[in-house]
């Protein structure tokens, strides 16, 4: 190597992973984009099953002619074997999203309600599920929703919106905060 030259060396050989593609919309992180992540198990089934050090993960997929195509990269934390790893590879350019507060009502000095609308347009050729992540404060309750709601913790809840090709899905919900 020459002076001041850097060389990248793979720590692990190429692994043929069984991955799950996750589309996620989180208004608090990116108000107008749907992120794309790949999730996999750090297991022997996936040619891994060993502690993974923190660092950059680069993701490639085979092109139509069999050559490798770079699709994204992310940094991961130290990951023990048999745990899930999630790598965010970028934003979906063919899924459009719009979020708006449609109404706000003050019920009492300590209670308010908001009507929220999230529009998702899928321009892909296949059906995808977009996880819509929402956050709230205080004592909250989703009182009405066009899709089933899933409480993640005291500050976060989610909806799974199935989006068919070239169609729009409109999620509406009412949240009451105390």
Regions found by a protein language model. Give the residues of each.
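Long, intrinsically disordered, low-complexity accessory segments associated with secretion
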Residues: 1-178
């Amino acid at each position: 190597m020459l002076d001041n030259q850097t060389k990248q060396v793979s720590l692990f050989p190429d692994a043929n992973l069984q991955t799950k593609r996750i589309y996620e919309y989180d208004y608090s992180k990116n108000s107008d984009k749907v992120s794309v992540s790949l999730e996999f198990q750090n297991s022997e089934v996936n040619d891994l099953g060993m502690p993974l050090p923190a660092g950059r993960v680069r993701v490639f997929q085979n092109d139509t002619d069999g050559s490798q195509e770079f699709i994204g990269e992310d940094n991961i934390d130290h990951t023990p074997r048999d745990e899930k790893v999630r790598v965010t590879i970028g934003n979906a350019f063919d899924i459009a999203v719009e979020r708006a507060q449609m109404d706000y009502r003050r019920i009492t000095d300590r209670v308010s309600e908001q009507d929220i609308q999230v529009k998702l347009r899928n321009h892909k050729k296949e059906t995808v599920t977009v996880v819509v992540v929402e956050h709230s404060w205080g004592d909250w309750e989703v009182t009405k929703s066009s899709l089933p709601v899933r409480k993640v913790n005291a500050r976060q809840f989610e909806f799974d919106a199935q989006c068919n090709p070239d169609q729009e899905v409109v999620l509406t919900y009412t949240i009451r905060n105390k």
